[in-house]
Amino acid sequence: MGDYVVVLEAPIIVKDVETSEDAINVAVSKVTKALNKEKLDFVRVEIGYSQCPVCGAHFESAFVIGSVGLVGMYLTLKVYNAQSIEHAERIAKAVVGKALKKVPLKVFEIRELEHDGENGIEAEELNGEDV
């Protein structure tokens, strides 16, 4: 049995927005509200990033066309006692999918948590932050 950090990608559609900043704010609020309603406040919500195919620069994955926005988001959670990476993926999708019905979820990254054998402290870091 292993413990994993699972990062899921989710496309969130928002309506009645004018700018990409508005779309991001509404999407974060919408996702956070849905997760909190299901008592999933342990899921970390972050804005996704895309890469420009021409210059290679990274930018926030938020696009607005005709007052409708599409925001790419990363949802990060820990999965404990999974039998395999595939099992951790299924658990993460089931847990988050319960709150975000009709939102397609795709695995962006899965990493196994490392534990300090002495006291069980997790040594894995995610984007420079302790998880």
Curated annotation (Swiss-Prot):
Kindly list the cysteine pairs connected by disulfide bridges.
none
Report the sequence similarity comment from the record: Belongs to the UPF0212 family.
HAMAP family assigned = UPF0212
The name this protein carries in UniProt is UPF0212 protein TK1194
Please spell out the taxonomic lineage of the organism that makes this protein.
Archaea, Methanobacteriati, Methanobacteriota, Thermococci, Thermococcales
